Amino acid sequence: MSSSFSLSSLSSVTHHHHHLRRHRLSPSLSIKNSSNNKPPTTKPTSWVSPDWLTSLTKSLTTFGPKDESNIPIASAKLDDVSDLLGGALFLPLFKWMNEYGPIYRLAAGPRDFVVVSDPAIAKHVLRNYGTKYAKGLVAEVSEFLFGSGFAIAEGSLWTVRRRAVVPSLHKKYLSIIVERVFCRCAEQLVEKLKPDALNGSPVNMEEKFSQLTLDVIGLALFNYNFDSLTTNSPVIDSINALCKVIPRQIKAEKAVTLIRQTVEELIVKCKEIVENEGERINEEEYVNDADPSILRFLLASREEVSSAQLRDDLLSMLVAGHETTGSVLTWTAYLLSKDPSSLRKAQEEVDRVLEGRLPTYEDVKNLKFLTRCIMESMRLYPHPPVLLRRAQVEDVLPGNYKVNAGQDIMISVYNIHHSAQVWERADEFVPERFDSEGAVPNETNTDFRFIPFSGGPRKCVGDQFALLEAIVSLAVLLQHVSFDLVPDQNIGMTTGATIHTTNGLYMKLTQRQRQTASTFAAANSSS
């Protein structure tokens, strides 16, 4: 449940009135068993000077001609601009990393960014949040939606709201949500997919995963069923619209208004129930049996907080939780479909561990290979692919790079995760790179080489929620179906709050016989 800055928001900040056409891009990954990798489409040259962005960078840098920062300036060509301002922003950032190294300066419209692709520098910036660095541009761009929600709040407000929200995500809550929400919603998805599996119709799995994660986050946050897998509504349309057009604030105003009204109504109804029942938290890992939602926990805590602040906090989790996990599921399914041996290995593990049962919280720790597949997917397709911070004071970064107060820093998670200086076989899908008997990889045990949930004080508060949701959802899906990519698709990439496909992820599904304890035992005895 990562708090994601919309990369396409950058185009709104830097390029309000210019629209550059979005072109299709093929993924640059070299996936095992894949022969589908094609270079990005070459765009025609233009009459515009190809070095205009570099000139703009030099004119905007605060260091002037006597630049003592030691940071090289990227020479941006026009061919890269449509990706920067309307497409897959992280791809030109990766190209420039290979040309200029792990840190360089870049102008995007009127803004000057220092782009970081080095784990040590990323660690320094992320760990020094609050003393040397702040969210900066993230808060400015997202305020129209999240208001003062803890995902973008700064200073003492962020500290107070984070302390209020984090206790709601305790182990007992997660254990109950796995059974009541994750499993049930995944089963509903399977039922929805069965007709397509039987008749061989192509299914846009990106769309289905988005619907699944919206239903999950609605129930987990508010005990509210969006039921987006089977129905549609103006609220669902508004949430989906926000995830696609967050930077286009005029178009998003109606969506924001409707979503805020819906959340406010849910808060009022839940508050009435809590007041009527005289409910109060009486234990550390408190869960209301009838309504285990985060909203119920926060209201039962009896903390003095305005309805507007509570609304903003919940909206932060709604949009981030829905968007992030949907993308994780999409790209993990894509990678597994490109690597049949890993898909079979994941299915065999699911069959062996679960023996036809629905997964429990305790089962998840035994789904080691599936977990590594998901982590490797988040390495190759991180959500979000960049993190933004702003220097509050003058600072010297590791490597003796100097930044001034007010400098915007763009940490390219995508670059760090794809760097050949950081990872062996960096562009390949290799789940086994993460030892199945070792700890689940995170920013700490990889020394910030792997930062899918950010790091430091502003690390995603919902990382365990999101990972559990992805593991359980895929485990249930793999129990019931196998999937193959529809041939001749152009699975390009574009960026919203996370990495999306350009045209969907179409798959053909094949129904599997669900393994029970008896069928699994019989299969083992005959082998």
Question: Where are the regions that the model predicts?
Answer:
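N-terminal membrane-proximal hinge/A-helix region immediately C-terminal to the signal-anchor transmembrane segment
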Residues: 2-15, 19-148, 154-156, 160, ...
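Cytochrome P450
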Residues: 2-12, 51, 107-114, 171-184, ...
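Cytochrome P450 heme-binding "Cys pocket" and the immediately downstream C-terminal segment
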Residues: 340-342, 409, 464-500, 504, ...
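Conserved cytochrome P450 K-helix/beta-meander segment immediately N-terminal to the heme-binding cysteine loop
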Residues: 411-441, 524
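Conserved cytochrome P450 catalytic core segment spanning the I/J/K helices
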Residues: 170-171, 252-329, 362-363, 367, ...
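Conserved cytochrome P450 K-helix E-x-x-R motif and the immediately C-terminal K′/meander segment
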Residues: 80-101, 258-261, 265, 357-399, ...
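Central I-helix of cytochrome P450 enzymes
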Residues: 213, 217, 221-222, 259-264, ...
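Cytochrome P450 heme-thiolate "Cys pocket" and heme-binding signature region
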Residues: 320, 437-470, 494-496, 501
